[in-house]
Amino acid sequence: GPLSPLLANIYLNEYDWEMARRGVPVIRYADDIVVLAKSKRAAERLLETTRRYLEGKLKLKMNVGKSKVVSVFAIRNFKFLGFALGKGKNGIYIRAHTKSLKKAKAKLKELTSRSQGRNVRVVMQKVKVYIRGWLGYFGIASMKTTMREWDKWLRRRYRSYIWKQWKKPKTRAKSLMQLGIPEWQARAVSNCRKAYWHMAKNGHVQRAISKERLARAGYYSILDRYESVHLCD
């Protein structure tokens, strides 16, 4: 629960001071700890020192399965607090870990589910709240290309959502015509029986439910938000 990180900080404060006294750089959030060392031998020694201190002095059980020595230069990346940290051709990088991205996209998919039957503006507001919170944490990560792809994906999700809500061919044709699609094209598209997701990519549907119209309806661009909070590149 919310109290657990606070209790961990209080209880492990003694460990922080001990490592600081020894001149050992430590990054810690609650009970997730990264201990930095200059060599593999030093890292292995510090891992054992940490285990003895936590288990002997503080009477805590260290998860041996999750505790290991890694080099940010020798491996592709390592995961910490939902981030993937490593070194690439352009130097050290911080990215959202694959698992974090997968979890976030699953949540967005859930929030934009066509089965909920809510007004699309209500759905957009819920998505906006989630995006702001998620990027408030992960906005430091380098992932502009991913955010651009998600932006397109979300707009398509909304188009398929709206297309389903229009339900009947007559309603779809009328709505398309009101949004500027010629009658003969609107009627042809409205009678198409292809899946909602497929129809969301139809040129006439995209023109009717354009990026600008979605924005006026309350669409919150995940790419724009990312660019406004990401200050590291």
Predicted regions and their residues:
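Non-catalytic terminal/accessory segments
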Residues: 1-233
